[in-house]
């Protein structure tokens, strides 16, 4: 499961460039019905999710994909972050739930600079992480929230490490 922050529609292409295998995407259900992009979304295997979080079929479809050994990319913020802030939007919990229920590793990635036309976008991928401390036990909503916070902390860490490396590089160049 690829899990990252979300700035724009083009963010979906970053995880796709890291794998030769196909990749599915978890996205809002309305994408599948959009006039132009809907056909493309269906063709690349988008799994539509209802925004209210009550769609059991979405979870079941995603679990089936993962259990078949296929990959999913998702943005746990649930929508594009248009705030201009460095803070991530609140995570909605689905990524940790899927990783735990299917015992699938999470590949965290962070988009360090918002994509801009004709500008370099920096995307950092972390090492796969397991949420194995949550496997094979009865979990509470607080447990899922803690797992999701662990993922969010890893994204912040990846971005902080990238920025520290960039600052050190600039300092050496002076």
Report the location of each language-model feature:
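Catalytic centers of nucleases
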Residues: 56
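Non-catalytic C-terminal accessory region of glycerolipid acyltransferases
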Residues: 59-174
